[in-house]
């Protein structure tokens, strides 16, 4: 079909503008994919653990309450409590605990004074004065070892992609 001797259609510039606008609309309108199958479970759990430890350190100082991060090494569950929680609140915290993915497990938790604990329940305390128990949390994902160093007075958690120990 022609109009005044020209072929009807869109120019390349018009098509590029329309595609760019559609791309921008999709970028801002689609929700972020939380359960992306391409994300590595060990990285997701590592970020969760690091974030949880940093949050508890900050909360202990801000709220002036002692917090405790509990690990059940046999079931791979992690939960938090604080000193002002009732028994019912503590039971709810255990029921709503974070469960590690099946392919990721906590091997042990190492303390400088107590040594390595590799079964049962282990607790790391976060005190209202701003310090915490010094500990190394060791995880294993297949043949990959991950270590998280929690320092008493340093807010950030150190992460190692190896099995680190206080004896090293």
Go through each PLM region and give its residues.
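N-terminal helix-rich module
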Residues: 2-3, 28, 34-47, 58, ...
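Hydrophobic alpha-helical segments, principally membrane-spanning helices and signal/leader peptides
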Residues: 14-16, 49, 113
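Active-site-adjacent beta-strand anchor residues
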Residues: 15, 69-71
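Conserved catalytic core of two-component sensor histidine kinases
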Residues: 19, 43, 50
